[in-house]
Amino acid sequence: MATKDVKKICIVTAYPTQGAGSGTLITAQARTYVELGYDVTIITANNNTQFDRLPGVKYVLVPFTGEKEPIEHLEGALPFNFVMFTSHTNSSENFDNIKIEQLKAYCSKFKEIFEQEIKTNKPDIFHGQHCWISTALLTEYDIPVVTTIHGTDLMGYVNAKNKLAEINHEIAEGKLNPEVYERKAKYEFYMAAAEKAARNSKKIFVISHQQERKFKELFPFAADKVVLVRNGCDRNIFYRENPEDAKSVLDTLSSNITLDGKLPTDFDKLAIFVGKFAGFKRVDLVLKAAKIYEKEMKEKGKKVMTLIIGSGALEEELKNLQKSLALENTHFVGRQKADVVRKLQSISDVFLAPSDEEPDGLVYKECLLCGNVPVGTNSGGVPDTLNPEGKELTPISGTKVLPADYGVLIPMNDEEALADATMYVLENRDIYDRKKLMDYAAEHYDQMKISENIIIPLFNEAIANRQEER
């Protein structure tokens, strides 16, 4: 039988294509597939139709109902919001809170959309995002599925396993009410769905060595399917702008603490955070570190301005922390589009991202492509990006700061180390050559190269393997 190469690619995500790293990655990948001449569809969950769309890509909506006014009433929408592992700007619904009846409706709606797409377009391959429910459902059809692991799905599986152990303990102690058994059924379903997705996918894409180890630990039966496929960035969007030209972007942003709502311009150094306000992103550490480095740099005659770029469920809590810390030069400026983020990365002196166990982090790569210096935690997939050769790093005397080739690493949950690392970069900015940072990121994290040389051949291999099985 002659083998068939991929022509029609259907990317499936149970989340919106904006507001989280997985959506950014999907968008970058889809753009490259279109440029390479493929027919591309994105099936995406959302509670509205007002979102950015790529030319040449067909978008199929899995409709949900939003929480915030104005609510767009979508035809056939589920009567609840799209469901997240952590949080999203436009949804507070998560897999811990959802009820069994909602889960049944959730699965039915996804299957309805999948079957419509198969009937009308018959894709050659499904590219499922997250080893979770929607991907498990995809594997029920006679079309090969490859799955990208994003990290939150592995966290979700571990959470389900832990919650199930707690529930079984409650039952053993005699708590036999219906609510306990409903929760038990829910977490059993989550674990079974993740295992089904792992077992039935033709390929499993992981985005870091740490994630590869974790996936194989949780799903040893699917270890032979795992392929390391780095997250890439769209170099048409992320590149270094001339700082003098890019500075005007500050005039377009609003501060949450100044009387006139404008950002001050009399700063000497600029630090930024970019990301969603989820617990593991540790925006709280950025604020606590800012309290330290604002004061110490001020004593040295330097004013550091810090911009917090993003939004999410923890926004009110974080702004309350900002107020309690009496931060003078730290400003929340809201979620911003990619072109604004590019300009801010281009004019910034340091990028702060102290996440707990960040699976990979596109933002580090976007930062490097713009010639900025990232500070990240020595955990998860971050060392793969900032210290790719796995060198033995020596801390700066009297600190826990580990300068690496392409940024600075610190321990998790340590605001003093984050403050020390920030000041190290601000006071020694010339140690990191901007061109070296950009060249490294362009060589290793160009999404077009990754798509053309790695992903498309793996799609074709998955299709060929499926044909051999028939």
Where are the predicted features?
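Short alpha-helical donor nucleotide-sugar binding micro-motif in glycosyltransferases
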Residues: 335-336, 343-348, 455
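Short hydrophobic beta-strand element within catalytic cores of glycosyltransferases
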Residues: 373-376, 383-387, 392-394, 399
